[in-house]
Amino acid sequence: MVGVGGGDVEDVTPRPGGCQISGRGARGCNGIPGAAAWEAALPRRRPRRHPSVNPRSRAAGSPRTRGRRTKERPSGSRLGDHGRGRALPGGRVGGRGRGRAPERVGGRGRGRGTAAPRAAPAARGSRPGPAGTMAAGSITTLPALPEDGGSGAFPPGHFKDPKRLYCKNGGFFLRIHPDGRVDGVREKSDPHIKLQLQAEERGVVSIKGVCANRYLAMKEDGRLLASKCVTDECFFFERLESNNYNTYRSRKYTSWYVALKRTGQYKLGSKTGPGQKAILFLPMSAKS
């Protein structure tokens, strides 16, 4: 109420005795006549809801934040389609998995461990030959021949162990006879297939029959013969091919190769060439 002098006057309207006014209505007035009607006349306050509980505000959002992100994706979070996990920095990328492996990439797995590195392929070893142990891929690295070119006995310690040259074409071993003939034979017990390879220079070798005491030579007409003395026709370029077979090409007649036919006879040098099976040989140990 407002007083005559403009000052405020306290409201002294009588209320039922024993009533206490609270923020949500009168308490203790249920037993007083007329208290119910008086309480109904009081203004009621509706309880306020927290903004986070209001479903409309949660669905629609405020105009200021609608249509934009309020938080940036943390660094190292997972990238990809419907992923739910957040991997550590350097985490996996792509897929729908929920794994948290820090290093795994791709896939849909849910593993939590780092993938084990794939084992390196085993080194290619020597393949066993049909007639014994094979020195596949070996290149002769031997000292040079004596300057006098003598055909005497080999000085001890100057040569590697004797070899057998196994031809891929027909499965023959290169054989040098004491009378100078050259051919192939399948029996590995034949003593004339035991050969001594000696390096004259890098990549160049001579081939000598241990029992025949003769050197393999390529003649000008392409024939293979065994010479008692070392000449310029007795040296061959030794090359390791990609299939682990060796080829022996004449140093004097550079387009001709040592070769054996499927019948076991030697092949004329003029009829040989790269890629033929007849020119492929495997050096095998003669001790077995």
Swiss-Prot record:
Sites where Omega-N-methylarginine occurs are at R108, R110, R112
Q: Where is the composition biased (Low complexity)?
A: 113-132
Q: Does the keyword Chloroplast apply?
A: no
For biological process, the GO terms are: angiogenesis; branching involved in ureteric bud morphogenesis; fibroblast growth factor receptor signaling pathway; growth factor dependent regulation of skeletal muscle satellite cell proliferation; neurogenesis; positive regulation of angiogenesis; positive regulation of blood vessel endothelial cell migration; positive regulation of cell division
Residues annotated as coiled-coil are none
Instruction: Identify its protein family.
Output: Belongs to the heparin-binding growth factors family.
Write the protein's name.
Fibroblast growth factor 2
Q: Which organism is it from?
A: Pan troglodytes (Chimpanzee)
Q: What is the lineage of its organism?
A: Eukaryota, Metazoa, Chordata, Craniata, Vertebrata
What gene is it encoded by? FGF2
